[in-house]
Amino acid sequence: MKNKKGYLLLETVISSFIVITISISLYTLLLHSSKYKTSVEDRVELYEQGEEMCFQINKTIENSDGIISIRDLNGNTISGDTPSYVNVNSIKCKYKNSYRDVKDKEISYKRNHKLFINTLNSRGNSESGGYEIGDYVDFISVMIQGNKVAVKLSLSKNNEKYETYFKSYIKEF
């Protein structure tokens, strides 16, 4: 029998070191790719939610006969032009007139980070029900400039953030 003089132990240590290094590298690569995939999915979802909310809000405001009222987070009614964006809870739009018997609508922000479109009863209060148009909403802000309402939506999911801006034209305010 040959005497290898410790080479077997050295070969085992080197082989183990190489296997452990490759394993750690692959694990790190897998972990980072998983985080990146989640981040991209969150960004895409926020973008899609933002686009859908913009479409629904714009359609609701522009198809109305005007804005009834806009309320900020403190419950104060906003009237006239605003110099900057103001965070709001609700935007009430007038739909009912002498030619059509349709209920007025409200775009409302809920504290659970959701945005809803509700119908209003004859006293101007939200009826139960309504439908959710978006999720992950941090806040909705408006800036009124004449017959235009500039809307800013701020969304977030996990560590991803997304903001979108658009303008809606109103008939009367």
Q: What is the meaning of each model-derived region?
A:
Residues 1-2, 143:
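Residue-level marker of regulatory loop/turn positions in helix-turn-helix DNA-binding domains and
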Residues 2-62:
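Aliphatic-rich helix starts adjacent to a transmembrane/signal segment
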Residues 34, 130-132, 164-167:
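Surface-exposed beta-strand edges and their flanking turn/coil or helix-capping segments
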Residues 55-71, 78-82:
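Extracytoplasmic beta-rich ectodomain segments of secreted or membrane-anchored proteins
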Residues 71-146:
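Type IV pilin-like appendage domain
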Residues 140-173:
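Short linear sequence signals and composition-biased patches located at protein termini or domain-edge surfaces
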